[in-house]
Amino acid sequence: MDMALPEFSMRQLLEAGVHYGHQTARWNPKMAEFIYGDRNGIHIVDLTQTVPMLDQALKVVRDTVAKGGRILFVGTKRQAQKPIAEAAEKCAQHYMNHRWLGGTLTNWKTVSQSIQRLKQLDEVLATGAEGLTKKERLNMEREQQKLQASLGGIREMGGTPDLLFIIDVGKEDLAIAEAQKLGIPVVAVVDTNNSPKGVDYVIPGNDDAARAIALYCDLVSRAALDGMSAQMGAAGIDLGALDVAPEEETLEA
């Protein structure tokens, strides 16, 4: 059966600045085949290639979720942190947006122990932390905040993911190396200054502009939701009957 997939147009990509690469001097020759030309010293990405490649990436995201797989969204640079977290939360997936924790994939056992510690701290602090001195409580709160910042987005992952979605492969090279070691496929936005090496599903495009990042995150999140509805549909659940409560979104300042 052909499942739905979020639609997007070349025009949307242009409006979001997906075609703007980096200064020609900063280019990576490995991206040459995806470069259309240059304008005022800036490389322009060939969107006639980006469109089908982005479509292919979204299919992989959707199909992974439809089979019950887990997706890890990775983007730790400042302008990607919020959209990465929001997109992952919107489709009940997982994210790392603070700093890539070495061993997140290759040493999952140790990472899951830290997640257990975070859950334990949450519990103790939520129940009022009785019998603790002020100093002990403060230390616990500090430890909790630190763990929450680095592990909050993967606390419910429950094991290594089945697919990674990455923004800025130059910055997230450690994540790619770990995924390669474990044979976990990678979907990633690759700008003209980076190498597509190690990326299974390349999305050639700008990885700095806020609007471009927001667009990729939104599309990937919607593709994951399409996969989820396909999975539930296969299980005979009517999604129309499950109204998603929008209330909680309005609480955010």
From Swiss-Prot:
UniProt keyword annotation of Ribonucleoprotein present: yes
Keyword RNA-binding: no
Pfam families reported in the protein's UniProt record: Ribosomal_S2 (PF00318)
Ranges in a coiled coil: none
Entries under PROSITE patterns matching the protein: RIBOSOMAL_S2_2
Family note: Belongs to the universal ribosomal protein uS2 family.
The protein, known as: Small ribosomal subunit protein uS2
Organism the protein comes from: Cereibacter sphaeroides (strain ATCC 17023 / DSM 158 / JCM 6121 / CCUG 31486 / LMG 2827 / NBRC 12203 / NCIMB 8253 / ATH 2.4.1.) (Rhodobacter sphaeroides)
